Amino acid sequence: MEPLSIDKPFMYFDEINNELEYDPDSANEKHKKFPYQGQLKLLLCELFFLSKLQRHGILDGSTIVYIGS
């Protein structure tokens, strides 16, 4: 198997439905209430992203190997 190099990721999140779901104020948030809340949020966002790909049929016929954070 030959490695493949690409200029950008396969797909950006906003390319699925042309919506950018980013709140610029999130950079100014206060510290989290418990130490691993950020990792939990990241995991939930990753799962949400995969489910969104599935709902739009982008993953049809694909095998997904998920290596999470």
From Swiss-Prot:
Displays methyltransferase, positive regulation of the poly(A) polymerase and transcription elongation activities. Involved in the modification of both mRNA ends and in intermediate and late gene positive transcription elongation. At the mRNAs 5' end, methylates the ribose 2' OH group of the first transcribed nucleotide, thereby producing a 2'-O-methylpurine cap. At the 3' end, functions as a processivity factor which stimulates the activity of the viral poly(A) polymerase OPG063 that creates mRNA's poly(A) tail. Its main location: virion. One of its GO terms (biological process) is methylation. It comes from the Viruses. S-adenosyl-L-methionine binds at residues 39, 66, 68. This is Cap-specific mRNA (nucleoside-2'-O-)-methyltransferase. The keyword DNA repair does not apply.
